[in-house]
Amino acid sequence: MYPFKISSLQDREAFYTGEFDIEKGEEWFEKHPPAPQLFALDAGTETKIAKDPEKINQIINLDSGISFEKLKEKLIHYLPEDAYYDRNRYKEPQKALAMIQKKDYFNNPNFLGQELAFDMDSDNLKCEQCRNKKFIDFCLNCFNNLKKKVPEAYGLLKEEFKQVEIIYSGRGFHFHIFDKKAYALSLEEREACNERLKGYFMDPWVSRGRIRLIRLPYSLNALVSRIVTPLTLKEVEILDISADERVIPEFLKK
């Protein structure tokens, strides 16, 4: 069993310089267009571990139009706690920063739509083993209870949408919806989706549309030292995150 631990800067450097395969991420977006217009990094808000301490509690928004090759260079430079892509679609992404700061995306003329996504998070559970846990703590028992609900949640989403993808996020699962109609959903329609998925431990802010960022596939979740990994439903059902080689970074194996 490999531990769930906060990744040190040395761990992050080992991952992004040696193991991280940016081509896998690029291929994933090619299969699930459109490709992101913007990416963002969190240097160390939760762990308080950052290469540049002045960047703690800041979201580092990268320039629009950045290539995947340049994105990897930024990951190696900043060694972030988390790496994200922006689910919003913009007419002019280079002008998006002002509206991002206001968080009033849906009423802005520069806004074209947002990828619908659901964040099923073990942080939303409590059990006898972790009654007093803090946000940064991880409970494997809660995660395994969460995993049991994935097939039901996936089934509900497939009743309404055709293109539903699952990504193991490190502490839970993300459901990505790539149907064209989903991008055009209003805030009210997204809230209705939340209502249908009550009881599945979702973070409503993500699917409601107010949070634009979601984890970059194949990046490192530095809160638990696990690789953000796309999976099929069958792969989810047999997933053992304490031992599955696909989600374990090499620095834990040494």
Features from the language model and the residues they span:
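Long, low-complexity, charged/polar intrinsically disordered accessory regions
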Residues: 1-12, 24-25, 195, 201-254
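Short, surface-exposed linear patches
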Residues: 106-107, 138-142, 197-199, 236-240
